[in-house]
Amino acid sequence: MKQEVIQGEDSYCCSLSKEVQEVARLELNETAKVRKKALAEVRKWVRSQPQIKRARLDANFILRFLRMQKFEIKESCEILDKYLTMRCQYPTWFQNLDCQDPALADLVSKGYIFVLPERDQHGRRVIFSRAAAFDPTKYTTSDMMRAHVMTFETLLQNEENQVRGFTYVFDEKAVSWSHLSIWTPSEVSKAFSCCERALPMRHRDINFLNLPWTMSLIFQFAKSLLSEKIRSRFKTHSGLESLQRSVDPSLLPAEYGGKTSVAECITSWKRELEAGREELLELDQLKVDSSAPVGEQLALVRKKSRHDSGSGSEVIRINFSGSIGLFLFSTYSPFPLTDRLLLRC
């Protein structure tokens, strides 16, 4: 089957301000010369891959991966390959990212996950999630995953977001074991496999608010396996005063000390989702030959990762009593490859 192209090669037209271009140069090694050469090399690589049956070659799409990997060609191609594989192998999580889908529309309307209208003091968009708005008796793990991926993919359409990265606020008030128990062991394993550096995002500031003490043990175990660099980006806040020291309070929803109500933030975010809807649905046309098991397809990525120490993944088992039979935490996620934590509950 000859490779098809959904969006072909285009001439890059920079939409970044001078300020953001300087951020890209300093943080991502991006210059006009580097960018032009890198785009050509990745496009050449995509065209040479027989497993990629339907591709995008436009600059906006390819630059997501280059910027994530600071224009390291090999690493960018590896992440792109994995991204395409995950989209095709797990369509219930990565496809039909339609803001008009009843479940997704309901989750957005209830304020489970939305993006604040204004950028923070670092120029980043702020992704806001409220666990209390997710009813584990009504929604599925697929609904949860698609809601998050729909949010990420919509934001990545904007190249300033690709450069700046993202700030997160997770309000964990009312989160309980019932939120975790909807995940089967195989789904948890699959979820972390999917997120193993597959989404081209820069996670810059991660804030947890109202984390229940019952969840703090799991949080601390997962956090302890991260590198110091990543751990430094995690912040826990017992109250609004602490959160407001990390995120400009004027940007937060009114219910959190800001100016704009949650309802207004949701309305604004819905408009953005609608504006990006067609491009998101077009992503479903991407296609790779996913006949080989995920482990085989991604072995090269793991082996060659510049973050891999070469010692393999160490598995740690810790016994708990509780309602969940098995919970897997992998600090791969979007972060450097490290060891895994296996919680047997």
What are the language-model segments listed below?
Residues M1-C345:
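Basic, amphipathic alpha-helical/coil surface patches used to engage anionic, phosphate-bearing ligands
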